[in-house]
């Protein structure tokens, strides 16, 4: 994947403002609420019976932070995303059996969360760069499935 200097700047500039704990928790909670079938991968998280329960669930919050922290590794390694996510791809494919479509769904939700939190900074050019990034990350995570 080729990144222009402008794309890199738009991605890293916005990433520097992201509260990983809050945005990660919100993104994962939205995934579980909007796409309830994804909850089956989180049965050990306890009460996911309603949006209120999901939003208040400390395990959702903690895992959301973990997910977005990993996403930060992509931002730091834009030129080597495939290798950055090789182990996570293996884990999600071989051990967790996560449908790779869920990576795309989470990427789309992350775009929504970023747009909501950073409306002024989230210009169409910024969105295009981030859309490219979430697509590349989703592809890297799905790599072991092929």
From Swiss-Prot:
Is Ribonucleoprotein found in the keyword set? no
List the molecular function annotations (GO) for this entry: haptoglobin binding; heme binding; metal ion binding; organic acid binding; oxygen binding; oxygen carrier activity; peroxidase activity
Its GO CC terms are: blood microparticle; haptoglobin-hemoglobin complex; hemoglobin complex
SUPFAM superfamilies found in the cross-reference section: Globin-like (SSF46458)
Q: Which UniProt keywords apply?
A: Heme, Iron, Metal-binding, Oxygen transport, Transport
Q: In which tissues is it expressed?
A: Red blood cells.
Biological process (GO) annotations held by this record are: hydrogen peroxide catabolic process
> Matching Gene3D superfamilies, A to Z?
Globins (1.10.490.10)
Which positions, given as ranges, span the membrane?
none
Q: Which residues form the Globin domain?
A: 2-146
Q: Where does heme b bind?
A: 63, 92
Taken from the record, one Pfam family name reads: Globin
Q: How does it assemble?
A: Heterotetramer of two alpha chains and two beta chains.
Family the UniProt entry places it in:
Belongs to the globin family.
PANTHER family given in the database record:
HEMOGLOBIN FAMILY MEMBER, HEMOGLOBIN SUBUNIT EPSILON
The record describes the protein's role as: Involved in oxygen transport from the lung to the various peripheral tissues.
Entry protein name: Hemoglobin subunit beta
Lineage here is: Eukaryota, Metazoa, Chordata, Craniata, Vertebrata
- The encoding gene is HBB
């Amino acid at each position: 994947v080729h990144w222009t200097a402008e794309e890199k700047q738009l991605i890293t500039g916005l990433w520097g403002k992201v509260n990983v704990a809050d945005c990660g928790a919100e993104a994962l909670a939205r995934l579980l609420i909007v796409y309830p079938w994804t909850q089956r991968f989180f049965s050990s998280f306890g009460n996911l019976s309603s949006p209120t329960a999901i939003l208040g669930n400390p395990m959702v919050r903690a895992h959301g932070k973990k997910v977005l922290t990993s996403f930060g590794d992509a931002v730091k390694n834009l030129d080597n995303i495939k290798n950055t996510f090789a182990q996570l791809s293996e884990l999600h494919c071989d051990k967790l059996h996560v449908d790779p479509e869920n990576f795309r769904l989470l990427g789309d939700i992350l775009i929504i969360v970023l747009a909501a939190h950073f409306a002024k900074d989230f210009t169409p050019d910024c969105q295009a760069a981030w859309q490219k990034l979430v697509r590349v990350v989703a592809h890297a995570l799905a790599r072991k499935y092929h």
